[in-house]
């Protein structure tokens, strides 16, 4: 099993899907779970620690929109304490097409910067041991919710980035895969803004269709982590875990 005995960093591990997944990860017995999030939640950290006292759960304040140099600085602190990190989960995300710059900064640039920052410690060309990255993207990276085109585009960009660097694993020693949840019943989807208010009732319309619980999503998330398949595009929708076969329409040839 991949999770057991490992050191894991979970960016945004206290959110809706994030906290539920953190619970499932802790139950699977990692050595350390390090949660990076924008807001402290001591009660949640205590709950996670109590779920499995053999796991050390720690917390650091972190905003994915900080300069990459700040991320490297924080990672140096974590690596100095734990010596090794086996898995980085990038889970930060917002859904609000009124906030164009922040949506891109959190959903795409933040994922890129955090992934790039940890390469300083993992890249085998620098003598690093390699590692694994799991990036939470979205099914909107496959087909957009057209009323929130900024959100959908940011997730498509994160998916493209993830799939690209997975192909560099033989060079960097770092394997990568994407986690793409379908509509999950969290606070994120209950109230959000469409682009230019083209659909004021977008949340209500979206929730009129079947959704999945955050627990169902989290359980499948852990299954994907345990599968540990480089380049996998995982769809986590309506309680199912499916690997997506990406259709190639063009190839650079290099």
UniProtKB/Swiss-Prot annotation:
Keywords: NAD, Oxidoreductase
Pfam families attached to this UniProt entry: adh_short
Binding site for substrate: 138
EC numbers on record: 1.1.1.1
GO cellular component terms, A-Z: cytoplasm
Binding site for NAD(+): 10-33
Example GO molecular function: alcohol dehydrogenase (NAD+) activity
SUPFAM superfamilies: NAD(P)-binding Rossmann-fold domains (SSF51735)
Residues annotated as catalytic: 151 (proton acceptor)
Superkingdom of this protein's organism: Eukaryota
Record family assignment: Belongs to the short-chain dehydrogenases/reductases (SDR) family.
Name of the protein in question: Alcohol dehydrogenase
The species this protein was found in: Scaptomyza crassifemur
Gene designation: Adh
